[in-house]
């Protein structure tokens, strides 16, 4: 018997194994039947079947399966199979979801029957599995049934295999499965229940099937159909036509096939190039494609209909999708060919053969189907009751919620629904009342569509049927029983009315958004808002709005700082309307529906258009309390939350605009202009300054470090706003008109606009400030004078309210900059101001000429079709040069006595300025306002030039601006002179579109555009479907497009390059270049006349260009939405871009380049409100300085300006001699002004710049534009750079001097005021980040690459105290730009041009590279001396010297200690404190140290004065002190330090300490590594710096708060750091630092002294992936030499010992070149372990990092100096390297898996966004169609039937509100898509950088290093862009939260109650 038993057991095991291994449905059933017969089991005994089967099959394989199934069945919810013992369930459909539901019900003990109409599982389609799904299937023994299940990194499975697994489990658990049985319908219980009680049954096919008598209590529909079970209404989600093709190819499992990588998906959102390449090569046009490898090679793709028609796949085109895809209309052969071609291309032709697998019909397994519409059931369950029998009806799977296939949601959400349904059945069996049961089920169903792998619980082990274990924050009662009464279907209930709908809780958002609004309400609201405004009487929605005053009144009502209502002329309807349209679009994202010209020309504006337009204001502002001006100002001054400061009104109404638009109103402007304020509040101007002071950039006292954080955020937002405004206002003729009009009026609109004191007295320019002493105290006499001028200017420009207001704000802030410190200097300023007035007068003359030229150039843009002469003539006729307000302004404001500050930004003294390529204009209103943080609204150019001498405040900046504007205009020859500098400039463009039809004519198809379907961009109106790329015809979105203003064409991002390279553009460029050369000649002749003005103007122009918003580049508010693509936004590229003169006509409408770069640059300029204007001045200075070396010569007010001196310099000099502080303030003001008003480069220049970059991809960023010596050379730096105004001191632009001699530049401090002599080299971009001195080692450019403001970087490098200024003779133009040095040579002040730079740039002086040797040596020595000697040396030196590393210094460099050299400490304790503060900021590597020179030029006290300043506690002062701080470490150095910190534990421990180290490292290293690798992101965001000490301001000489600058400037570090950076990569030692620089991605390198926490926080802010540092650790192992170089952070090596120490460290690695016999130094004590996780690192990933750390530590331990190594280094190295290799492989594998998972997450998000965008588009199209129908009826063009006009209008209004919501939603999706695209790009760049760093340093050549630098720089830029997006989203979130709170309080105040759902 025993043998028989054993045999039976063996046989049973074999039969069971056959069942488990069955590979088909039929085979499985057959094996199961054999098994049950063999074991004598009854399958119908569902309660005992599993337990009997388990007892009879006891093989070890079976036991493993039983263990898993028992573990699942042990959940308490099942109650050991007794929860639902009396329940009978019928499941229709045997798919994965139906079977999974059956398994759960079987565990509950229910009787489960599954009917499946097929008898085969033939679907090879592959499903993506979520992590929880994989875990769940493993728990059911999936591995036992299918050994390959999710092996390795596989996370997908074919439907067939999944069905087999679940099928077998269900059979084992006693589920009754019937195949070849089709469900027909449910049969109700018969009415005759007396004889026998028959319950619910079903009808099947075949009709005689035994199941026909089966009665059940629960029926579940799981067949994927939409109408199998009655009673479920469906919601349709219609997207664009989506045709999916699935193809399965035979998988022969060959080695070649195994090597082919799968494609988890390619999303069009962030990989458009792939699809465009596919289309070009094969003609196949797809939207996405996925490739999975399983039993087959499975491809699924979404094809575009036109592509299918072109390839002959679809024979005829039909509108009806069913007809389109019917078998008769599909060519099967072409379909097979289409699928094969796509598969080949997607796999890069690596699959050896693509033979189609066969389906169950014996045909090639290729299918085409439509999923244009996806459906979801409105409800998940219902209860039917008949004859006292209740039936629970439920849906699961696709029947419940149809999935979007690329997302992989079908299986995951299907399983979740199965669990929820089983939970419901359990409750049903326990007697829960039907309504409660249904309410709970619906509550869960509402969560289902929102579930993602990220928002469900991560602890899969705890998953049970209970929804609380799966859904976090579950509210299972959000749906109330009364809300589901309609789901309880019974005769008795049908007659009962449902409860009032009002009782249903609605979310606050819904309640508010859906409030019932009628046109009458709209009219009443408008009347209320415009009540009390002069000349405004709203009686209707048409004629009352014709003058434009009513629109302006509404905007002024809620945002008084945006419009100067008092300056508006009632008769000028065109400009009033255009102003309102432009401000609304720029600030609120409300697109115009017509133009100002049309509004004024029509007798009665179109009612429908007005209803639609005004409704957007209503939705935006309704319920918004007016914010008291004073409180607003106070909040702003206190750095109150930006979003709150906005007063709950988002900058972009519909989120339509991207970050640039969202920027908070950071300007210091008050809610109202001074006049209004006085009128409403009764405050005198004297009081106003105090209000502004808190906001003013320069107010050190009020803007304490506590405000810094707020300021930084403001800076970002302001930068964004500036960009948007700058671009938008680029072509606003209306502004010019407005200015003209205002000037004509001549009444002093705002007497006090310039300065508070001035306001009261309106003193003459010469007069000192009037008596108001308190305010006077802040104001310099010059300020008063300029104030007067400003007032006059303002009068002229009163029309441009925006301008006037900014002026005021700026003036105030400037005055404050002067602060009390300036009070003493008041008397001295007057003479200077007067002297300035003379300069200004000369400037004016020059400007007039420039303006004339500029008008001609503008004509080119506007009328590109004509030749230049014709264009000029046309412009002259249109705008009349004589009319320019310039003359008026000049005469009025710029008298000799007065330095009338052209600052009055409005009319900018020179009309040209205002007209200046809307550069100024664009910058003007909008920008200015945004800039207004500083309060400046001048044209950027004006401000820059003016501010130095005029007054610290408005005047000085005004003058600088005027000069700069002139230069910009001249150089950029942008638009016609827009007279109004106000934001209207853009409006002007739109008002008078030269080549446009009316707003009701489509720009593309020339057909009529009805109001509801009208879209607008760049002043054009068009249909949605007409808005396509000119090349590929891809439909464009308002948030993502590029525009060539010359040709009037729109492009998609990938094809924008086309407009840069086509021949027409080249020709145009050539013409422009010639023109510019002629202009340059003219300018040279004029230069002597202009003197400084010329120079400053040039600088200004450069700045403008840097700003990057090419004047031509019209920036629609929407364009700001789109973030420039990384490739376009290369700040470096921009920097390298040709001078403005070179910039060619192409303009990227979305501001691809300009946008990204501009935003950065602008951000820098605007950066700190609290920061003194210095910050901005730094920018300006950098521009000037970088262009050429300058010596600063003290300038005496009496002395004439040197011909080459920049106006800014002259001004600063005039001021500086007497009072360093005053000059400082003045300089700051100037800089700020400059920064704000950088003229934008002409589009031509932009084009040229981009083209130039494209020619030299690697070096383009570092290269200067090809020999473009235009005098006004805007810094090549990216537009963003341009934003920074040239500091007065650095303003001198070498390029400015026509002769090529660079105008002298003044250093920031008067004593230093040195003008470096140099030849004007085209200003190379300050960002030389990438540029490396030819002789110098290539280092990772400072963080600057990120920021468009490289200019600062230049300065930064030069810390006057640390790096001596090189002798003027020595300095080349590059040298002049110390900031650049940090970029190129982080350590050196001199910028070494890339080799390319040197070539391309025209150097009047010797090339940097040649200088590198000598100068560097001198410099290094000098630097050292300076380091030790402190500021004194700096004073002595007039020029910057380049530092050359001596061998000793090189070794010093290797001392990676962050600590400052003792000499430095001893030299200046103050410096140390400053430094620490700076480091506290996070010591951004990228931070260029502020141009030390510039700060001084600003009037910053000399280093000697530093001590006194430092004593002052204000951050600004500290910042000044910072200048003196030792030069920042080069990024390389910083990186090396960071790396050292992270790796030192590995390197430094001795053998004995290895174990301890391994433990510690596992904890410490990850955090450190994180810090090292990625603090980049945060620094970019400008947030981290603020968080730290006030020292963060250090980067800027004057304004500590300037966040933007901060980001760019390098932390000031001991100069010793620079030596290595400066030294050429001759030795390995030098290479290491260089390598390190490249390796480290961290922007901020905290000092070693800083606690690790700060580093960690920086890292977290970056949100970079753990993988990056882990991989970095691995890479670091390969570089043993580097590793050894890192010393303990605390250990200091004296310079003399550093070489020896280095050699010792390198010994173990046998670096033959460095190896020495010296014994290795003892290991330093291990640093305290940092917190367990770095801010950004996920705790869950920490273990991996720990492993990495351990591995690396052990690996490094061999290499690290240890006793073992000393005795037998070779042996230990070999052994450990083997271990390391194994671990590395393991880690690499894990890393790849993590990378893939992250990629998948992004992919699914992208695909979901893509689908949602398509759905929104379809809904918009549907609403547009309906809107057109209504519009025709309202206009009498169609029969309206029985509806009267009131009904139609009401319907129209509802439609308008619906469309507004859709637009809002679309804008949010687009922002999400953009962020996702940047995230993906960042991830790829990180991976690329890691791969490059894996290469041994010794094997890298110059090309490798350059590529590494480029990748690093690009990565920085991407991070910067992501930060901006995230900030804008956060702003929006806070704003909406504030709105909700306000709404709730409003509701509660009326005794109502709201509940959220």
UniProtKB/Swiss-Prot annotation:
It is found in: Nucleus; Cytoplasm. Zn(2+) 1 binds at residues 1002, 1005, 1023, 1026. Residues 687-714, 1232-1243, 1302-1316, 1570-1579 have a biased composition (Polar residues). Residues 911-925, 1275-1294, 1485-1496, 1751-1762 have a biased composition (Low complexity). Residues 1185-1195, 1388-1402, 1413-1431, 1552-1562 have a biased composition (Basic and acidic residues). Residues 1796-1945 form the bMERB domain. Residues 899-910, 1718-1733 have a biased composition (Pro residues). Residues 516-619 form the Calponin-homology (CH) domain. Residues 1324-1363 are annotated as: Interaction with MAPK1. GO terms for cellular component: actin filament; cytoplasm; nucleus. One of its GO terms (molecular function) is FAD binding. Residues 1000-1062 form the LIM zinc-binding domain. GO terms for biological process: actin filament depolymerization; cytoskeleton organization; heart development; heart looping; positive regulation of transcription by RNA polymerase II; sulfur oxidation. It holds the Pfam family Rossman_Mical. It comes from the Eukaryota. A motif (Nuclear localization signal) lies at residues 660-681. Its cofactor is FAD. CDD domains: CH_MICAL2_3-like (cd21195), LIM_Mical (cd09439). Interacts with PLXNA4. Interacts with RAB1B. Interacts with MAPK1/ERK2. Interacts with RAB35, RAB8A, RAB10, RAB13 and RAB15 (in their GTP-bound forms); binding to RAB35 is of low affinity compared to other Rab proteins; at least in case of RAB8A may bind 2 molecules of RAB8A simultaneously through a high and a low affinity binding site, respectively. May interact with MAPK1/ERK2. Interacts with CORO1C; this interaction recruits MICAL2 to the actin filaments. PANTHER family: [F-ACTIN]-MONOOXYGENASE MICAL2 (PTHR23167:SF39), CALPONIN HOMOLOGY DOMAIN-CONTAINING PROTEIN DDB_G0272472-RELATED (PTHR23167). Methionine monooxygenase that promotes depolymerization of F-actin by mediating oxidation of residues 'Met-44' and 'Met-47' on actin to form methionine-sulfoxide, resulting in actin filament disassembly and preventing repolymerization. Regulates the disassembly of branched actin networks also by oxidizing ARP3B-containing ARP2/3 complexes leading to ARP3B dissociation from the network. Belongs to the Mical family. This is [F-actin]-monooxygenase MICAL2.
């Amino acid at each position: 018997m025993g043998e028989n038993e054993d045999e039976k057991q063996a046989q049973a095991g074999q039969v069971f194994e056959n069942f488990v291994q069955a590979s088909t449905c039929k085979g499985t059933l057959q094996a199961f039947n054999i098994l049950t017969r063999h074991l004598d089991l009854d399958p119908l005994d569902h309660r005992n079947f599993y337990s009997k089967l388990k007892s009879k099959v006891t093989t070890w394989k079976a036991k493993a399966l039983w263990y898993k199934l028992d573990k699942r069945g042990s959940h308490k919810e099942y109650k050991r199979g007794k929860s639902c013992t009396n329940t009978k369930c019928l499941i229709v459909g045997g798919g994965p979801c139906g079977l999974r539901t059956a398994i759960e019900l079987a565990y509950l003990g229910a009787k489960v029957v599954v009917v499946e109409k097929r008898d085969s599982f033939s679907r090879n389609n592959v499903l993506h599995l979520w992590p929880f799904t994989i875990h769940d299937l493993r728990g059911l023994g999936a591995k036992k049934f299918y050994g390959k299940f999710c092996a390795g990194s596989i996370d997908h499975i074919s439907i067939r295999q999944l069905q087999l697994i679940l099928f077998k489990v269900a059979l084992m658990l006693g589920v009754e499965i019937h195949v070849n049985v089709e469900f027909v319908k449910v049969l109700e219980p018969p009415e005759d229940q007396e004889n026998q009680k028959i319950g619910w049954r079903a009808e099947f096919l075949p009709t005689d099937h035994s199941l026909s008598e089966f009665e059940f209590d629960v029926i579940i529909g799981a067949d994927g159909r939409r109408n199998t079970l009655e009673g479920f209404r469906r919601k349709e989600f219609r997207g664009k036509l989506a045709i999916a093709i699935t193809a399965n190819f035979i998988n022969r499992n060959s080695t070649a096939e195994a090597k082919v990588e799968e494609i988890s998906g390619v999303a069009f959102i962030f990989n458009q190039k792939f699809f465009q390449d596919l289309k070009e090569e094969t003609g196949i046009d797809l939207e996405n494609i996925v490739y999975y490898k399983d039993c087959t090679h499975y491809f699924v793709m979404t094809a575009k209909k036109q592509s299918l028609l072109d390839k002959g796949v679809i024979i005829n085109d039909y509108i009806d999708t069913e007809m389109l895809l019917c078998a008769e209309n599909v060519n099967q052969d072409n379909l097979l060919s289409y699928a094969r071609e796509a598969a080949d291309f997607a796999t890069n032709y690596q699959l050896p053969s693509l033979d189609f697998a066969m389906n169950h019909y014996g045909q090639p397994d290729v299918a085409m189907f439509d999923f244009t519409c996806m459906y979801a059931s409105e409800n998940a369950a219902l209860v039917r009751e008949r004859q006292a029998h209740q039936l629970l009806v439920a849906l699961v799977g696709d029947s419940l919620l149809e999935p979007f296939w690329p997302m992989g949601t079908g299986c995951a959400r299907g399983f979740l629904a199965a669990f929820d349904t089983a939970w419901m059945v359990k409750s049903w069996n326990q007697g829960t009342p039907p309504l409660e049961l249904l309410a709970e089920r619906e509550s869960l169903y509402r969560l289902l569509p929102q579930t993602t792998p990220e928002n469900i619980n991560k602890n899969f082990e705890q998953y049970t049927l209970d929804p609380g274990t799966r859904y976090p924050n579950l509210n299972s009662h959000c749906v109330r029983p009364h809300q589901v009464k309609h789901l309880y279907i019974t005769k008795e209930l049908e007659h009962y009315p449902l409860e009032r709908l009002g009782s249903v809780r609605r979310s606050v958002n819904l309640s508010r958004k859906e409030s019932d609004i009628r046109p009458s309400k709209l009219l009443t609201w408008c009347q209320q808002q415009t009540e009390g405004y002069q000349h405004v009487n709203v009686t209707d929605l048409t004629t009352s709005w014709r003058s434009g005053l009513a629109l302006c009144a509404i905007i002024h009502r809620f945002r008084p700082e945006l419009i100067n209502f008092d300056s508006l002329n009632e008769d000028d309807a065109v400009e009033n309307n255009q102003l309102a349209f432009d401000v609304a679009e720029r600030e609120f994202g409300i697109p115009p529906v017509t133009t100002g010209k049309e509004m004024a020309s029509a007798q009665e504006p179109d009612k429908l258009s007005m209803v639609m337009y005004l409704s957007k204001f209503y939705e935006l502002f309704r319920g918004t309390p007016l914010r008291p001006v004073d409180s607003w100002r106070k909040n702003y001054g206190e750095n109150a939350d930006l979003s709150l400061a906005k007063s709950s009104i988002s900058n972009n109404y519909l989120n339509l605009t991207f970050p640039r638009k969202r920027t908070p109103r950071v300007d210091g402007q008050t809610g109202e202009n001074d006049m209004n304020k006085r009128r409403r509040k009764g405050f005198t101007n004297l009081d106003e300054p105090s209000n502004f002071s808190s906001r003013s950039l320069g107010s050190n006292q009020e803007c304490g470090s506590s405000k810094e954080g707020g300021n930084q955020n403001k800076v970002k937002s302001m930068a964004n706003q500036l960009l948007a405004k700058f671009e938008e206002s680029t072509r606003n003729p209306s502004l010019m008109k407005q200015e003209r009009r205002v000037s004509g009026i001549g009444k002093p609109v705002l007497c006090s606009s310039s300065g508070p004191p001035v306001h009261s007295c309106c003193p003459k320019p010469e007069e000192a400030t009037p008596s108001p002493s308190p305010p006077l105290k802040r104001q310099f006499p010059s300020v008063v004078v300029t104030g007067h001028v400003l007032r006059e200017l303002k009068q002229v420009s009163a029309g441009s309210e925006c301008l006037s207001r900014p002026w005021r704000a700026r003036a105030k802030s400037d005055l404050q900059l002067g602060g009390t410190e300036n009070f003493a200097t008041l008397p001295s300023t007057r003479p200077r101001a007067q002297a300035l007035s003379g300069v200004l007068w000369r400037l004016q003359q020059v400007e007039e000429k420039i303006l004339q030229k500029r008008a001609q150039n503008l004509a080119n843009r506007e009328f590109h079709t004509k030749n230049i002469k014709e264009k000029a003539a046309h412009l002259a006729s249109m705008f009349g040069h004589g009319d320019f307000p310039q003359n008026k302004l000049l005469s009025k404001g710029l008298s000799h006595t007065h330095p009338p500050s052209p600052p009055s930004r409005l009319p900018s003294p020179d009309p040209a300025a205002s007209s200046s390529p809307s550069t100024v204009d664009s910058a003007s209103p909008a920008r200015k306002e945004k800039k207004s943080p500083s309060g400046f609204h001048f044209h950027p150019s004006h401000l820059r030039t003016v501010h130095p001498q005029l007054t610290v405040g408005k005047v000085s900046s005004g003058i600088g601006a005027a000069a700069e504007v002139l230069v910009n205009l001249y150089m950029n020859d942008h638009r016609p002179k827009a007279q109004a500098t106000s934001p209207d400039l853009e409006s002007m463009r739109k008002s008078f579109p030269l080549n446009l039809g009316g707003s009701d004519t489509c720009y593309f198809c020339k057909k009529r555009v009805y109001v509801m379907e009208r879209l607008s961009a760049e002043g054009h109106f068009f249909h949605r479907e007409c808005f396509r790329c000119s090349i590929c015809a891809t439909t464009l979105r308002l948030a993502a497009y590029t525009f060539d203003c010359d040709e009037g064409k729109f492009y998609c991002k990938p094809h924008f390059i086309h407009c840069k390279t086509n021949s027409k553009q080249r020709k145009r460029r050539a013409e422009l270049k010639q023109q510019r050369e002629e202009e340059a000649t003219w300018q040279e002749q004029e230069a002597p006349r202009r003197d400084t003005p010329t120079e400053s103007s040039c600088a200004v122009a450069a700045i403008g260009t840097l700003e990057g918003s090419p004047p031509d580049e019209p920036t629609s508010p929407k364009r700001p939405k789109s973030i420039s693509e990384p490739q376009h936004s290369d700040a470096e590229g921009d920097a390298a871009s040709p001078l403005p003169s070179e910039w060619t006509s192409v303009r990227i409408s979305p501001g691809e380049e300009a946008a990204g770069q501009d935003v950065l640059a602008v951000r820098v300029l605007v950066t700190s409100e609290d920061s003194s204007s210095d910050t901005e001045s730094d920018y300006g200075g950098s521009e000037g300085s970088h262009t050429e070396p300058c010596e600063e010569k003290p300038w005496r007010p009496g002395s004439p300006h040197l011909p080459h001196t920049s106006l800014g310099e002259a001004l600063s000099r005039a001021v500086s001699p007497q009072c360093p502080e005053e000059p400082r303030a003045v300089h700051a003001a100037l800089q700020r002004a400059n920064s704000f008003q950088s003229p934008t480069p002409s589009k031509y220049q932009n084009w040229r710049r981009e083209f130039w970059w494209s020619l030299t991809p690697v070096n383009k960023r570092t290269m200067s534009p090809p020999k473009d010596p235009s005098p006004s050379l805007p810094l090549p730096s990216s537009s963003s750079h341009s934003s920074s105004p040239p500091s007065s001191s650095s303003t001198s632009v070498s390029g400015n001097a026509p002769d090529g001699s660079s105008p002298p530049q003044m250093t920031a401090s008067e004593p230093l005021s040195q003008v470096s002599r140099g030849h004007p080299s085209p200003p190379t971009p300050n960002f030389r980040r990438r540029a490396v001195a030819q002789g110098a080692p290539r280092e990772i450019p400072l963080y600057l690459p990120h920021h468009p403001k490289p200019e600062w970087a230049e300065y930064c490098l030069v810390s006057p105290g640390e790096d001596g200024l090189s002798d003027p003779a020595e300095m080349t133009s590059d040298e002049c730009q110390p900031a650049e040095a940090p970029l190129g040579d982080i350590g050196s002040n001199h910028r070494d041009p890339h080799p390319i730079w040197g070539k391309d740039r025209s150097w009047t002086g010797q090339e940097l590279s040649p200088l590198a040797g000598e100068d560097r040596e001198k410099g290094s020595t000098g630097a050292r001396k300076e380091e030790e000697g402190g500021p004194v040396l700096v004073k002595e030196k007039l020029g910057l010297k380049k530092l050359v590393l001596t061998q000793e210094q090189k070794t010093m460099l290797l001392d990676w200690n962050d600590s400052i050299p003792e000499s430095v400490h001893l030299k200046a304790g103050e410096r140390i404190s400053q430094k620490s503060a700076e480091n506290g900021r996070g010591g951004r590597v990228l931070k260029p140290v502020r141009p030390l020179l510039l700060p001084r030029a600003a009037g910053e006290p000399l280093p000697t004065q530093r001590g006194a300043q430092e004593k002052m506690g204000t951050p600004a002062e500290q910042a000044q002190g910072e200048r003196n701080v030792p030069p920042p470490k080069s990024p390389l150095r910083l990186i090396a330090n960071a790396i050292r910190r992270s790796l030192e534990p590995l390197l430094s421990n001795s053998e004995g300490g290895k174990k301890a180290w391994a433990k510690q490292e596992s904890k410490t290293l990850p955090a450190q590594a994180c810090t090292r690798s990625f603090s980049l992101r945060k620094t970019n965001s400008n947030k981290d710096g603020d968080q730290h000490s006030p020292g963060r301001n250090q980067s800027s000489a004057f304004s500590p708060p300037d966040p933007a600058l901060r980001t760019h400037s390098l932390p000031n570090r001991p100069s010793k750091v620079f030596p290595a950076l400066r030294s050429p990569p001759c030795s390995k030692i030098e290479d290491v630092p260089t390598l390190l620089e490249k390796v480290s991605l961290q922007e901020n390198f905290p000092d070693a002294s800083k606690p690790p926490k700060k580093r960690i926080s920086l890292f977290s802010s970056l949100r970079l992936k753990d993988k990056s540092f882990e991989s970095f650790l691995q890479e670091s192992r390969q570089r043993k030499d580097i590793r050894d170089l890192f010393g303990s952070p605390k250990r200091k090596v004296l310079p003399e010992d550093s070489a020896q120490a280095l050699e010792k460290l390198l010994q173990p690695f046998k670096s033959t070149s460095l190896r020495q016999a010296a014994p290795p130094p003892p290991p330093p004590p291990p640093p305290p372990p940092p917190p367990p996780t770095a801010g950004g690192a996920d705790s869950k990933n920490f273990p991996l990092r720990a492993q990495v750390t351990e591995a690396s530590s052990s690996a490094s331990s061999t290499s690290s100096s240890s006793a073992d190594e000393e005795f037998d280094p070779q042996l230990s190295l070999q052994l450990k390297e083997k271990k390391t290799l194994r671990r590395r492989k393991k880690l690499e594998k894990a890393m790849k898996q993590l990378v893939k998972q992250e990629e998948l997450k992004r992919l699914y998000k992208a695909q979901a966004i893509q689908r949602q965008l398509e759905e929104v588009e379809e809904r918009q199209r549907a609403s547009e169609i309906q809107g057109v129908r209504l519009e025709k009826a309202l206009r009498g063009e169609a029969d309206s039937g029985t509806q009267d006009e009131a009904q139609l209008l009401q319907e129209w209004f509802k439609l308008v509100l619906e469309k507004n919501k859709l637009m809002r939603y679309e804008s949010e999706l687009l922002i999400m898509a953009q962020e996702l695209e940047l995230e993906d790009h960042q991830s790829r760049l990180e991976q690329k950088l890691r791969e490059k760093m894996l290469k041994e340093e010794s094997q890298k050549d110059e090309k490798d290093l350059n590529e590494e630098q480029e990748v690093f720089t690009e990565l920085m830029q991407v991070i910067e862009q992501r930060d901006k997006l995230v900030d804008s989203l956060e702003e929006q979130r806070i704003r909406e939260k504030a709105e909700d709170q306000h709404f709730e309080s409003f509701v509660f105040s009326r005794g109502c109650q709201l509940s959220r759902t």
